[in-house]
């Protein structure tokens, strides 16, 4: 019995994208790193959860460092060499993620803080009493 090849099935071509943006969303519980081209199409992404951390360990700077490293490795395969970093959120993984992106061989041209600041919008959650 001869095995038929599927008609129309083509291998997905990888586009070489040298310049892009890196979005780092750092919350208190997790850090998500997304690498995109200049139009905003996602090239690679990683979070502390996908890097193998669970629970409260996802909020640590080391977890953010590993997540950024994973995302940078995936993006380097697509040819990403230069990024502008946009950081959002108050989490502890902000600086660690940026340092990890620089250490992985990606050239960081600019770092911008795009954390949304309310003009007295929603009421914040009540204080924790431990």
UniProtKB/Swiss-Prot annotation:
GO biological process assignments: translation
Keyword RNA-binding set for record: yes
Keywords: Ribonucleoprotein, Ribosomal protein, RNA-binding, rRNA-binding
GO molecular function, one term: structural constituent of ribosome
GO CC annotations on file: ribonucleoprotein complex; ribosome
Matches recorded under PANTHER family: 40S RIBOSOMAL PROTEIN S14/30S RIBOSOMAL PROTEIN S11 (PTHR11759)
Subunit structure: Part of the 30S ribosomal subunit. Interacts with proteins S7 and S18. Binds to IF-3.
Assigned protein family: Belongs to the universal ribosomal protein uS11 family.
Described purpose of this protein according to its UniProt entry: Located on the platform of the 30S subunit, it bridges several disparate RNA helices of the 16S rRNA. Forms part of the Shine-Dalgarno cleft in the 70S ribosome.
Protein name, UniProt field: Small ribosomal subunit protein uS11
Taxonomic source organism: Dehalococcoides mccartyi (strain ATCC BAA-2100 / JCM 16839 / KCTC 5957 / BAV1)
